[in-house]
C-alpha cells in the first residue's frame, strides 16, 4: 500500500507505530526531557522494527512531525508452504501473495503454520507480515 500519515511527536504513545529509517516500527518507550530554560522539549523514541525486529531509537523535538504507517490488518488462508516462503490467499479479495518466511512470519507462529489454516496478516508500506493464527470464527 505505501500509505503513511504525519503525526506530532507529542501525540505518540508506547504500543503505537512509527516509521524510522523507512522501517515501520512499534514504539516501546518514549522519554520526554526538557533541555532547560530555552529550547523545546525533546522526545527520545525507542521502537522495534515490525519486519526485522531491530531496536531503533530517534530523538526529536516534541513539536516535530513524524511519519506513521497505516497498517491494514486482514485475514488470509495458507495455501502452500515451501522451505523459504509461505503462499497465502486473502479471504476478501482472493489475491495470493508469496511471503518470505524469515522476514514475513512472526517467530512465535513459524512452527505452527500449515496449509489450510487462517492467519492474520498485516500489510504496510508495500510489505506483508503474517502476525498470528486465527481461530475458528474469528
UniProtKB/Swiss-Prot annotation:
PROSITE patterns: IF5A_HYPUSINE. Its main location: cytoplasm. It comes from Pyrococcus horikoshii (strain ATCC 700860 / DSM 12428 / JCM 9974 / NBRC 100139 / OT-3). The modification Hypusine is found at residue 37. PANTHER family: TRANSLATION INITIATION FACTOR 5A FAMILY MEMBER (PTHR11673). One of its GO terms (molecular function) is ribosome binding. Functions by promoting the formation of the first peptide bond. Belongs to the eIF-5A family. It is found in: Cytoplasm. CDD domains: S1_aIF5A. One of its GO terms (cellular component) is cytoplasm. The keyword Glycoprotein does not apply. NCBIfam families: eIF_5A, PRK03999.1. The keyword Cytoplasm applies. Disulfide bonds: none annotated. One of its GO terms (biological process) is positive regulation of translational elongation. Keywords: Cytoplasm, Hypusine, Initiation factor, Protein biosynthesis. This is Translation initiation factor 5A. Pfam families: eIF-5a, IF5A-like_N. Coiled coil: none annotated. InterPro entries: IF5A-like, IF5A-like_N, NA-bd_OB-fold, Rib_uL2_dom2, Trans_elong_IF5A_hypusine_site, Transl_elong_IF5A_arc, Transl_elong_IF5A_C, Translation_prot_SH3-like_sf.
Amino acid at each position: 500500500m505505501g500509505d503513511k500519515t504525519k503525526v506530532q511527536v507529542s501525540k505518540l504513545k508506547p504500543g503505537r507505530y512509527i516509521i524510522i529509517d523507512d522501517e515501520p516500527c512499534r514504539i516501546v518507550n518514549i522519554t520526554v526531557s526538557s533541555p532547560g530554560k530555552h529550547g523545546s522539549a525533546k522526545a527520545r523514541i525507542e521502537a522495534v522494527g515490525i519486519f526485522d525486529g531491530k531496536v531503533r531509537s530517534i530523538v526529536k523535538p516534541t513539536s516535530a512531525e513524524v511519519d506513521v504507517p497505516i497498517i491494514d490488518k486482514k485475514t488470509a488462508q495458507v495455501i502452500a508452504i515451501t522451505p523459504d516462503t509461505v503462499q497465502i490467499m486473502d479471504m476478501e479479495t482472493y489475491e495470493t501473495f508469496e511471503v518470505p518466511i524469515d522476514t514475513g512470519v512472526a517467530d512465535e507462529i513459524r512452527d505452527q503454520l500449515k496449509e489450510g489454516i487462517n492467519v492474520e496478516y498485516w500489510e504496510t508500506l508495500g510489505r506483508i507480515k503474517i502476525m498470528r493464527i486465527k481461530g475458528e470464527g474469528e
